Swiss-Prot record:
Residues 878-887 have a biased composition (Basic and acidic residues). Keywords: ATP-binding, Cell inner membrane, Cell membrane, Cytoplasm, Membrane, Metal-binding, Nucleotide-binding, Protein transport, Translocase, Translocation, Transport, Zinc. It comes from Shewanella sediminis (strain HAW-EB3). It catalyses: ATP + H2O + cellular proteinSide 1 = ADP + phosphate + cellular proteinSide 2. Residues 869-897 are annotated as: Disordered. Monomer and homodimer. Part of the essential Sec protein translocation apparatus which comprises SecA, SecYEG and auxiliary proteins SecDF-YajC and YidC. ATP binds at residues 87, 105-109, 512. Its cofactor is Zn(2+). InterPro entries: Helicase_ATP-bd (IPR014001), Helicase_C-like (IPR001650), P-loop_NTPase (IPR027417), SEC_C_motif (IPR004027), SecA (IPR000185), SecA_CS (IPR020937), SecA_DEAD (IPR011115), SecA_motor_DEAD (IPR014018). It is an enzyme of class 7 (translocase). GO terms for biological process: intracellular protein transmembrane transport; protein import; protein targeting; protein transport by the Sec complex. The gene is secA. This is Protein translocase subunit SecA. Its EC number is 7.4.2.8. The keyword Cell inner membrane applies.
Length: 907
């Protein structure tokens, strides 16, 4: 109450922010008359002048007003489009590490040109990030004339480009591309073998379009570059035949009784669990097929792989549905993005799930994968020096943007008032009643000439509605993952008189639905259109536009509530753009997923109290409130999962940053001789300590063991016992010096034989290859650790602390192994000439070329399990990296040790 009074008196935080920025808009507007009088050459020269001022010490804030005014004037000349004042506000928000919420149709693409130009002046690179290749190409080509007019270069980074093409794209002032491609290029750069193979520059400024989709929806799906592991397709096929024999539990276990069945499904958590009865049945079936020894348990250590395959097959059959979660196309299982409804070719589920789905569908089973490199979008984007984003729906997730990324959200007012009518939800008892009402509503809209966009949550639902409309002889277009090639065309014409378009979820997002149809696209398809043809198309469009406005504008019809309010708002936001007329309504049934899982009891009791009968709908604020509360529950749960994923990945991220920094230092260094000398000393001292402990008597020395180890692992034949027998004054310290000295002389002899330059190159190649191999094994070990770590909660231990401690121990072991392996290879291998080094590098490149780079969307289920054992801890706010860590500074991983004794050991 008190807060509301303060807001009335002083305005909300958003109002105060906009008021402050409004002063700068006034300055920009004051420059408009002056810049209108400039010639094209004088306007273009402003770019050179701005760059000169920045080089002399001025900041971007100092030149912002003038730069924005220049972009506005250039846009008027190139596009015949003038930036509105609200777009100027949006541009300033985007330049200040914040998120701008701008409604659909308010010109986000044009708004982005302002901060992109301003930050492009620095020459450090601007990355404008979109959700798919089509939008990246479209926005780059649309805005290229403006940026090139002002002297800035534009690059496009999409899948399928060669190394040189990618490098050219990244060297441009402004680079458009998809989030996946930027992330994978970062990982690929950190798998490179020479500086010339890297394509990215340091990450400077990222401007993310549809920021909620990328930073929220995709946050649970880490990017993984993987290579094919062993072939186990036959095992997946055999295990797949077991699942039809299992029966779902008819009721959940309670204290009084045990449900009758082999497995139970937790729909809220999207998990499946085998019951004791199910485990016994699977063991019998496996034994019958000769896959399990008589009397052996599925849960014994030797059968963990079998258990993994059974669980994957069970999940594939019970939790993943064809035409909802994936489609089968060209003998391949292709994932459907649950948030956008688009297919994701090349993406694969991890942990054997994709192979299990392939076995279920009877298509070719591809090999399992081994992780070579991975990162979450959260940790990738937090590496940018500046980060900003824009979307039509960010306010509902404002807390998460601030909490995880440190980004405030500013709601930008619309240029014209919003007049769309959002009707209350209609709730029916059954889906049949709901679909009958939807068809009736569509028929009414068609009679009025009002276009309709029908939003569905799955391909299956969109095809069901399409069949119903066909039966009713209602002309319609279907836009889902199966027909994404025609996406832009279908969306562009969805605003024509009486048009009916069925769209899966938010497929088609990023393309405006223009009332009366998109006249610009009609002109585009013509070859050299005359002015008369263009004028006729525009005249015809104006007639259609007026008819549609008179009929009520675009009507949005939702067939089910999504588990996120934001996705529902995105669907509604397709109507009412730039002050257009429009309306929206959601039709629900008690059997919808959200209603069944979260809201059924409360709403059912309300319906009974109101005496509902078949075919009747309920429309009441109580129902809308109950549904919204259900959505809040799901949003809170999903936020917790994303937060946990980040907390776990932060541990791996510290290690990732250290390894990648070391790789880059190794690649950039002309010589790593000093590093090799330091490692050599560490290895020798550690080895001698094992067999001849410091300050110990000779009786405790294991000289034969030391000699054997030196010869077997390092190829060094040292007569240590002979030295001791002949020289009475040889004690532990002088013996250590003798061994080191002999080792160094042996290595120097190798250097004299092959030449210093060849050996320096060979050292670098060995160090990189060994580090890459061990890092790959370390990632696999971390995956295994994470998958079972939640069980520590049942032993009254904190899973996150245990994960942090054990992963640090694994990392320490990896560093020690790296030292020993590198010195072992350098000591034993005989390098004959430069050609040996080149052959080694070529072999590495050939192996790299064979890697099947499956870009996986990994599941976060192992992390979700930690919820059962541990309550969520408070999350540490994100702090962007500052200066380089000194060797004597505390290690950033939080171990309490000095950096040089912890993650800095390699340096």
């Amino acid at each position: 109450m008190f807060g509301k009074i303060l807001t009335k008196l002083f305005g909300s935080r958003n109002d105060r922010t906009l008021k402050s920025l409004g002063k700068t808009v006034t300055k920009i507007n004051a420059l408009e008359d002056e810049y209108e009088k400039l010639t094209d050459e004088e306007l273009k020269a402003k770019t050179t002048a701005f760059r000169g001022r920045l080089e002399s010490g001025e900041t971007l804030d100092d030149v912002m007003s003038e730069a924005f005014a220049v972009v506005r004037e250039a846009s008027k000349r190139v596009f015949e489009m003038r930036h509105f004042d609200v777009q100027m506000l949006g541009g300033m928000v985007l330049d200040s590490n914040r998120i701008a919420e701008m409604r659909t149709g308010e010109g986000k693409t044009l708004t982005a040109t302002l901060p992109a130009y301003l930050n492009g002046l620095t020459g450090k690179g601007v990355h404008v990030i979109t959700v798919n290749d089509y939008l990246a190409r479209r926005d780059a080509e649309n805005n290229r004339p403006l940026f090139e007019f002002l002297g800035l270069s534009v690059g496009i980074n999409v899948a399928g480009l060669g190394q040189q093409e990618k490098k050219a794209a990244y060297d441009a002032d402004i680079t458009y591309g998809t989030n996946n491609e930027f992330g994978f290029d970062y990982l690929r750069d950190n798998m490179a073998f020479s500086p010339q193979e890297r394509v990215q520059r340091p990450l400077h400024y990222a401007l993310i379009d549809e920021v909620d989709s990328i930073l929220i929806d995709e946050a649970r799906t880490p990017l993984i570059i993987s290579g094919a592991a062993e072939d186990s397709s036959e095992l997946y096929t055999k295990i797949n035949t077991l699942i039809p024999h299992l029966v779902r539990q008819d009721k959940e276990d309670t204290e009084e009784e045990i449900g009758d069945g082999d497995y139970s499904i937790d729909e809220k958590a999207k998990q499946v669990h085998m019951t004791e009865r199910g485990q016994e049945k699977v063991e019998v079936l496996l034994t019958e097929r000769g896959m399990l020894a008589e009397g052996d348990s599925l849960y014994s250590a030797a059968n963990i792989s079998l258990l993994h395959h059974v669980n994957a097959a069970l999940r594939a059959h019970t939790l993943f549905e064809k035409d909802v979660d994936y489609i089968v196309q060209d003998n391949e299982v292709i994932i459907v993005d649950e948030h956008t409804g688009r297919t994701m070719p090349g993406r694969r589920w991890s942990e054997g799930l994709h192979q299990a789905v392939e076995a279920k569908e009877g298509v070719h089973i591809q090999n399992e994968n081994q992780t070579l490199a991975s990162i979450t979008f959260q940790n990738f984007f937090r590496q940018y020096e500046k980060l900003a984003g824009m979307t039509g729906t960010a306010d509902t997730e404002a807390f998460e943007f601030q909490h995880i990324y440190g980004l405030d959200t500013v709601v930008i007012p619309t240029n014209r008032p919003m007049v769309r009518k959002d009707h209350a939800d209609l709730v029916y008892l059954t889906p049949d009643e709901k679909y009958a009402a939807i068809i009736e509503d569509i028929r009414g809209c068609r009679e009025r000439g009002q276009p309709v966009l029908v939003g569905t949550v799955s391909i299956e639902q969109s095809e069901l509605l399409a069949r119903l409309m066909k039966q009713e002889k209602i002309p319609h277009e279907v836009l889902n993952a199966k027909f994404h090639e025609r996406e832009a065309d279908i969306v562009a014409q969805a605003g024509r008189t009486g048009a009916v378009t069925i769209a899966t979820n938010m497929a088609g997002r990023g393309t405006d639905i223009v009332l009366g149809g998109n006249w610009a696209m009609e002109i585009e398809v013509l070859t050299n259109p005359t002015d008369e043809q263009k004028a006729k198309i525009k005249t015809d469009w104006q007639v259609r536009h007026d008819e549609v406005v008179a009929a009520g504008g675009l009507h949005i019809l939702g067939t089910e509530r999504h588990e996120s309010r934001r996705i529902d708002n995105q669907l509604r936001g397709r109507s009412g753009r730039q002050g257009d007329a429009g309306s929206s309504r959601f039709y629900l049934s008690m059997e919808d997923s959200l209603m069944r899982i979260f809201a059924s009891d409360r709403v059912s009791s309300m319906m009974k109290k109101l005496g509902m009968e078949k075919g009747e709908a309920i429309e009441h604020p109580w129902v809308s409130r109950a549904i919204e509360n259900a959505q809040r529950k799901v949003e809170a749960r999903n936020f917790d999962i994303r937060k946990q994923l980040l907390e776990f990945d932060d541990v791996a991220n510290d290690q990732r940053q250290v390894v990648y920094a070391q790789r880059n230092e190794l690649m950039d260094a002309e010589s790593i001789q000093d590093t090799i000398v330091n490692i050599q000393a560490d290895v020798v001292n550690g080895l001698v300590d094992q067999y001849i402990p410091q300050q110990s008597v000779e009786e405790l020395w294991d000289v034969p063991g030391l000699q054997t180890r030196l010869e077997q692992e390092y190829g060094l034949k040292m007569p240590v016992q002979e030295w001791l027998d002949k020289e009475d004054d040889l004690h532990e310290e002088t013996l250590r010096e003798r061994i080191v000295d002999t080792w160094v002389k042996s290595y120097q002899a190798k250097e004299e034989m092959v030449g210093e330059q060849v050996l320096r190159q060979f050292e670098k190649a060995v160090m990189l290859q060994t580090l890459d191999g061990l890092w790959k094994e370390h990632l696999a070990a971390m995956d295994h650790l994470r998958q079972g770590i939640h069980l520590r909660g049942y032993a009254q231990k904190n899973p996150k602390q245990e994960y942090k401690r054990e992963s640090f121990e694994l990392f320490q072991q990896m560093l020690e192994t790296l030292k020993h392996d590198v010195i072992s290879v350098l000591s034993k291998v005989q390098v004959q000439a430069q050609s040996d080094v080149e052959e080694m590098e070529e072999r590495r490149r050939q192996e790299d070329a064979k890697i099947q780079r499956d870009y996986q969307h990994a599941s976060a289920e192992a992390i979700v399990g930690a919820e059962e054992a541990e309550s969520l801890s408070a999350h540490t706010p994100v702090v962007r990296e500052g200066e380089k860590v000194g060797r004597n500074d505390p290690c950033p991983c939080g171990s309490g040790r000095k950096y040089k004794q912890c993650h800095g050991k390699l340096t």
